[in-house]
Amino acid sequence: MPQSLTKILVHIVFSTKHRADLITPEVEPNLHAYLGGICRELDSPLVAVNGTPNHIHMLVNLGRTVSVSDLLLNVKRDSSKWMKTKSSNFSDFHWQDGYGAFSISESAVPRLQDYIANQKERHAALTFEDELRALCRKYNVTLDERYSWS
């Protein structure tokens, strides 16, 4: 085959450092748009994004020449720098070191889009830690909690 064809859908989750509630309603829409721009620059269109004051969920169609780790390196580095320019309240803004990244099938996209869209309602009764534990169980990923909450 003379061309490379891919469709790699990835559900990505990461939090602010120490799960600090730093993503305010005022900055959230612009942050989401900025995340979309970073993904677009890496030929990895953002299909859905949402979150809470302390974490982000993204559904990304991963580009054929970018790895998940390279995508997240750029997303977290660039958006952290951007956040720090928005207000002195964000001068200490950092993302956590790690992330969760889970492959999903095309048939799961509508359900995941709903899941991402309803983050604030979901977290009225669920912590980020409990959500990540549930996602790891769902996707059969081993979670070592000694390294998961920094």
Pin down the residues of each PLM region.
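Basic nucleic-acid-binding interfaces
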Residues: 1-150
